[in-house]
Amino acid sequence: MHLARTLPTLQQAVHQLRHAGKRIAFVPTMGALHEGHQSLVRAAIAQDYAVVTSVFVNPTQFGPSEDLARYPRDEKGDIAILERTGCSIAWLPDVDTMYPPGDATGFVMGGPALGWEGARRPGHFNGVAQVVAKLFGQVRPDAAFFGEKDWQQLQVIRRLTADLLLPVAIHGVPTQREEDGLAMSSRNRFLSPEERAIAPLLFRTLLQAGHALSSSPDAEEICKNAIAALNGQGFDVDYFALIEGSSLSSIAILPEGDDWRLITAARLGSVRLLDNLGRAELARFRA
């Protein structure tokens, strides 16, 4: 695996892969890697791509009340994980490389960026779009792989790529879960033992709501009951809603097709947990 810390080093390594006839897939991360990130790399390798993975904690997607310094970092561990997962290039830029002096171009995202996380974290998706556009420009991949756990982010990236006519195929990869159903996240390490024991209830409640929607037309009542149940178990729920999967608009009745998601965000102690559920995952799990 190549380690690239400067843009010329990255570009040379990518050129070597292309010269060898490889297609390039890109997996952007903020580090503190876990099995969820590894699943993205493996998904790309399974489609016969050589994989470039970035590790960069992007400051522009953190709001004023969010602690950038607290975000977990483990570069040595990340490099070891990427190497054994089969990554071809680890891209480890610093802040000055990503945001050089005089940097004056940003994004104001609309559409799928406006509600849910976008409403609660103003500017967050502007920062996500900014860094992803820069990374795409640096790596110039044929494809990029993102986890479905951050469903809204995935739709924002799809919108960004389409709007800017970027020649990058965007792939969503199913959420990776712990054995008890908790969605894997770098922030899970901040849960206390007591909170960790409670945390899987978030996914179980999504499953219960999903199965209830299969037999009841009243999504609003089902989601209202889910919020009450979670709050009663120690969560502080930001939202729990049935949405159209692509537009992220709220819907009242479960549609027949696959273009829907149950989404939720809730705080447990100091940790904010996100999760979502679609038809394919609902079919695999019992409530």
Curated annotation (Swiss-Prot):
This is Pantothenate synthetase. Gene3D superfamilies: HUPs, Pantoate-beta-alanine ligase, C-terminal domain. Belongs to the pantothenate synthetase family. The reaction proceeds by a bi uni uni bi ping pong mechanism. HAMAP family: PanC. NCBIfam families: panC (TIGR00018). It comes from the Bacteria. (R)-pantoate binds at residues 61, 153. It holds the Pfam family Pantoate_ligase. It is found in: Cytoplasm. Beta-alanine binds at residue 61. The gene is panC. Its EC number is 6.3.2.1. GO terms for cellular component: cytosol. It comes from Granulibacter bethesdensis (strain ATCC BAA-1260 / CGDNIH1). The keyword Ligase applies. Pathway: Cofactor biosynthesis; (R)-pantothenate biosynthesis; (R)-pantothenate from (R)-pantoate and beta-alanine: step 1/1. Homodimer. The active site is at 37 (proton donor).
